[in-house]
Amino acid sequence: MIQQQTYLNVADNSGARKLMCLRVLGTGNCRYGGIGDEIIAVVKDAIPNMPVKKSDVVKAVIVRTRHPLRRASGMTIRFDDNAAVIINNDGNPKGTRVFGPVARELRDKNYTKIVSLAPEVL
């Protein structure tokens, strides 16, 4: 569960390393975000000479959370970290690679480009 002020790792090669969530997008008064939800975030740590700079406000989609995710089959998935992928306004990732596993729920929310770039889908 991601809320305001939550720090997330960046799971792509866009140039950012750490994000801080400013707002969870979606339904009206949405306080918490889960896997597949879009957020507005600020870049807190970045790699020099890359397209995304420190203090840039970006849009991202959550791909991993430490909070357990319960599926309809009864299976529970929990990742080791909170991570997001930076996207543009069209919903496509800014980076060309995605690091680490991502959840299958991203495919249901039409983030097929992120799923296809990921090395492992759980």
UniProtKB/Swiss-Prot annotation:
The keyword rRNA processing does not apply. Keywords: Ribonucleoprotein, Ribosomal protein, RNA-binding, rRNA-binding. Transmembrane segments: none annotated. Gene3D superfamilies: Ribosomal protein L14. The keyword ATP-binding does not apply. GO terms for biological process: translation. GO terms for cellular component: cytosolic large ribosomal subunit. GO terms for molecular function: large ribosomal subunit rRNA binding; structural constituent of ribosome. It comes from the Bacteria. Part of the 50S ribosomal subunit. Forms a cluster with proteins L3 and L19. In the 70S ribosome, L14 and L19 interact and together make contacts with the 16S rRNA in bridges B5 and B8. Binds to 23S rRNA. Forms part of two intersubunit bridges in the 70S ribosome. Belongs to the universal ribosomal protein uL14 family. This is Large ribosomal subunit protein uL14.
